[in-house]
Each structure stands twice: as C-alpha cells, then as structure tokens.
Amino acid sequence: MDNGMFSGFIMIKNLLLFCISMNLSSHFGFSQMPTSSVKDETNDNITIFTRILDGLLDGYDNRLRPGLGERITQVRTDIYVTSFGPVSDTEMEYTIDVFFRQSWKDERLRFKGPMQRLPLNNLLASKIWTPDTFFHNGKKSIAHNMTTPNKLLRLEDDGTLLYTMRLTISAECPMQLEDFPMDAHACPLKFGSYAYPNSEVVYVWTNGSTKSVVVAEDGSRLNQYHLMGQTVGTENISTSTGEYTIMTAHFHLKRKIGYFVIQTYLPCIMTVILSQVSFWLNRESVPARTVFGVTTVLTMTTLSISARNSLPKVAYATAMDWFIAVCYAFVFSALIEFATVNYFTKRGWAWDGKKALEAAKIKKKREVILNKSTNAFTTGKMSHPPNIPKEQTPAGTSNTTSVSVKPSEEKTSESKKTYNSISKIDKMSRIVFPVLFGTFNLVYWATYLNREPVIKGAASPK
C-alpha cells in the first residue's frame, strides 16, 4: 500500500515537472520567434529597397533632364538663411550662409514599396539628374563638406525629389551711397539655370513670395546694418541662347548711424565750435587766434580724409561729404574773419599813429608860441619890483600851460581805447556764425533722417 502511494506520488511529481518544462519551453519559444521575424523583415526591407534602387538606376541616364521632349521641368526652390553678414562697403559685397532647397519630379524614379519616402545618401545625387543652378551675382560659393558633404536627398514614390545643400555665398551688393551714412540698400541674391532656357526648365518659389526665403531669428551678423526684411521675385533675361528665368531675393538693409556720429559728426561739430571761440579773443592776440584757425583747418582736413577710408572711391559726394564740406567752410571762414579783423586793426593803429604825429606837431607849435609869450611877459615885467613870490606864477602862464597838457592826455586815452576795443566784425561773427551753423544742422538732420530711401529694382519689405 505504501509502495503504491509512493509510486503515485512520483508519477504526479513527474507530470508536474513535465508540464512546467513544457510551459517554459513554449514561453521561450514564443519570445524568440518575433525577434527572428523582425530581423528577417528588416533584411527583407533592405533587400527590397536595394532592388528598387538598383532597378531605378538600371538604364537611368543622368545626362537627360526629366520629361525631355514631353514637358518642361519645373524646379521649386526655397532658402533658409542661417547667417547673414558681414557686409563690405568697400568691396560692395555681402556673405550669406544658407540651406538651399530644390525640388523637382522625375518620373523615371517612381517606385512601389513599403515606404512612401526614401531618405537617401548624398552619393546618389551624382548618379541622377540635378538642376544646373548657379548664382548670377555670386563672387564665391562654398559647399560645406565637413564631416561629410552637407547634402540631403529624399525620394518619394511618385518620383519627386528634394535636394538640399548647405552653401556659403559671397555675392555682389550694388550700393548707392548718396545718402551715406543714412542710406539703405537691397542686396540681391540671383540664381537660375545655367544651360536650360525657359522652354526646358523653369524655376518657381515653393511657398510663394512670402515664405520662400526665411531668415533665422538669430541669423543676423551685422554690426553696421539693420536687416529690415526680405522680398522675393523673378526676372527674365534674353540672350542669344534663349530666354532664362532668374530667381531674385532682396535683403533690405538700413545702416546704423551711431558709429559715424561718434567718429565723424561730433568731432566735426566740436571743431567748428572751437574755431568760433577765436571770435571772443582779443583782436590783438594774433598768435592765439592764428593757432585756433590753423589747427581747426588741419583737423577738418584729417577728419575728411579718415571719413573716406571706409567707403569705396565713388565719383559723387555723399551726405557725409556735404556735412564735412560745410564744416570745413565754417572753419576756413573763421580763419578768414580773423585775417580781416587783423588787417583793419593794423590799419586803425596806423591811422591812430598818424593822428598822434599830427598832435605832436601841434603840441610843438603850441610850445613854441608859449615860450615866446613867456619870454615877452618876463621882459615886460622886469621894471617892476620883484615882490612876487617864486612859487607864484602869472595867470596867463598858468592858463597856457594847462591848455597844452590836456590834448596830450586826451590822445593817450584815445590810443588806449583804440587798442583794447572790440572789432565790429567780431561782434557780428559771434552771432552770425553760430546761428548759421545751427540752422544748417537743423536742415541737414531733418532732411536726411526723414527721407524715405528709394531702391531701384527692389520692392520694399512688408
């Protein structure tokens, strides 16, 4: 009985162990099957896409554009600006860093597969047809290749391609500097097909005229300009090989005036004010007034030369040139004013000397007459007893002597008054020069600061 119970217990135990082992084996078998299936599925997808790409490129001729002989190839473009600047005034060019995107449709690259869009390696770009886009006003362009070529290529199942590359472009920026430094400019970026005319390839903006060119919020790298906005458009040119479409994007710039106020305008204004200080100096202070005049003229000459160093050698006068020229005229006029005052001062001294000489002659004549009358009076009185004290002087002698002294004192006082007097020209200059210079500044700044810049060939930014 005991043996039967023991054998039954062993059978139950073995049955339980068998069930547990079956469950464990089934569990591990269930968890391993999906992993194997995923790997197989992934390998299958890679194999499928490899076969698709090999099939697409089999017999593909990248020398021929899509739709050759059937339709015009349309290339849609847009630009994302990551960095704008710097701008060189002397070279009239600017530098821009962009993501340049192009999209077109190539029916030869249609495919059917588990994915609608294939992100491809940039190496495939050399095996398919791509637009021959070039920049008309570009002086130098760099395609970034670190750490790999900065290019992106995507293919959709209907044959639509998206081709993006990162470029740094140095382009021409024609500038009209008549209003410098209160000027504004529209720097263009022009691109299009090099070989295909409008009858074969046309360019259009992807997102219309408002969102096809976007500048990053922190993309401005400008020290002397404000980036006011950008506008896009198209141009058509006709050559001997056909008509071509040129895509244009204008970047609107407004110059910052602060640097030039500190470096040029304030020094010029202070130099003019310093030249007018000489009007308040004594007109006989020839060395001091000469130093004021010559120093201010030389200072204005130095300022005018240094102001031109930051500009290209244009053949017309800028707004700053006009301001410097007027300041130079005020400084030079102050020097001429001193020369005029000095001339009339010396002439006045000569006139005073002539008067003094005539007065001296009259004085000598009076002294001769006085001596004769004194001698006659002394001779006539010798018969009378000398009861008059030595200190007492005859009335006639006393009166004559007093008359002869007074003219000398008056001439001396007049001479001193002429020497220390203020010139009428200086009095007028103290009022006229500051008023005229203040009026000029008022008109100058009101005219240029309120002027709306007109840029030919570019619409104003919205």
Curated annotation (Swiss-Prot):
Ranges annotated as spanning the membrane: 261-281, 287-308, 319-340, 428-448
Organism superkingdom: Eukaryota
Residue intervals on the Extracellular side: 32-260, 309-318, 449-462
Positions of crosslink type Glycyl lysine isopeptide (Lys-Gly) (interchain with G-Cter in ubiquitin): K355
SUPFAM superfamilies: Neurotransmitter-gated ion-channel transmembrane pore (SSF90112), Nicotinic receptor ligand binding domain-like (SSF63712)
GO annotation (BP), single: synaptic transmission, GABAergic
Residue ranges annotated as Cytoplasmic topological domain: 282-286, 341-427
Residues reported in the UniProt entry to bind 4-aminobutanoate: R101, T164
MF terms (GO), sorted A to Z: GABA receptor binding; GABA-A receptor activity; GABA-gated chloride ion channel activity; ligand-gated monoatomic ion channel activity involved in regulation of presynaptic membrane potential; signaling receptor activity; transmitter-gated monoatomic ion channel activity involved in regulation of postsynaptic membrane potential
Disordered: annotated segments: 377-412
Keywords (A to Z) from UniProt: Cell membrane, Chloride, Chloride channel, Disease variant, Disulfide bond, Epilepsy, Glycoprotein, Ion channel, Ion transport, Isopeptide bond, Ligand-gated ion channel, Membrane, Postsynaptic cell membrane, Receptor, Signal, Synapse, Transmembrane, Transmembrane helix, Transport, Ubl conjugation
Entry text on domains: GABAARs subunits share a common topological structure: a peptide sequence made up of a long extracellular N-terminal, four transmembrane domains, intracellular or cytoplasmic domain located between the third and the fourth transmembrane domains.
Family indicated by similarity: Belongs to the ligand-gated ion channel (TC 1.A.9) family. Gamma-aminobutyric acid receptor (TC 1.A.9.5) subfamily. GABRA5 sub-subfamily.
Subunit architecture: Heteropentamer, formed by a combination of alpha (GABRA1-6), beta (GABRB1-3), gamma (GABRG1-3), delta (GABRD), epsilon (GABRE), rho (GABRR1-3), pi (GABRP) and theta (GABRQ) chains, each subunit exhibiting distinct physiological and pharmacological properties.
Function summary: Alpha subunit of the heteropentameric ligand-gated chloride channel gated by gamma-aminobutyric acid (GABA), a major inhibitory neurotransmitter in the brain. GABA-gated chloride channels, also named GABA(A) receptors (GABAAR), consist of five subunits arranged around a central pore and contain GABA active binding site(s) located at the alpha and beta subunit interface(s). When activated by GABA, GABAARs selectively allow the flow of chloride anions across the cell membrane down their electrochemical gradient.
Record-given protein name: Gamma-aminobutyric acid receptor subunit alpha-5
Organism of derivation: Homo sapiens (Human)
Gene that encodes it: GABRA5
